[in-house]
């Protein structure tokens, strides 16, 4: 079981566990600082955010999660969504219409 703040180590790398509820309860993202990457599932997409119309989804919670957990990462961090093209934190800060 993983929780926000946990660090998963493998080899010489590590993933920091971030809690990003909103798309669904208990949603997690995984930040790999050594390669400046974050794996976000369906929380954030290039120019969009995840759906919140499923059971347990919350638009307000998702926006809060993205702003507090993801947009605070370094701008050059590459965002790898669950599907679709990759993007960067900086690009989403500047151009994602759902975050303004």
What is the predicted function of each stretch?
Residues 39, 79-80:
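Residue-level marker for buried hydrophobic side chains located in beta-strands
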Residues 71, 76-79:
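Catalytic cores of DNA base-excision repair glycosylases
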Residues 83:
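Short helix/loop segments within enzyme catalytic domains
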Residues 92-94:
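C-terminal domain-tail junction helix/linker
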């Amino acid at each position: 079981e993983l929780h926000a703040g946990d660090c998963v180590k493998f080899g010489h790398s590590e993933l920091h566990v971030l809690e990003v509820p909103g798309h669904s309860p208990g949603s997690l993202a995984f930040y790999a600082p050594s390669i400046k990457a974050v794996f976000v599932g369906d929380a954030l997409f290039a120019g969009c955010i995840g759906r919140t119309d499923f059971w347990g989804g919350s638009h307000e919670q998702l926006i809060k999660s993205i702003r507090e957990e993801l947009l605070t990462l370094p701008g050059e961090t590459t965002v790898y969504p669950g599907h679709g093209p990759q993007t960067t934190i900086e690009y989403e800060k500047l151009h994602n219409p759902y975050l303004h």
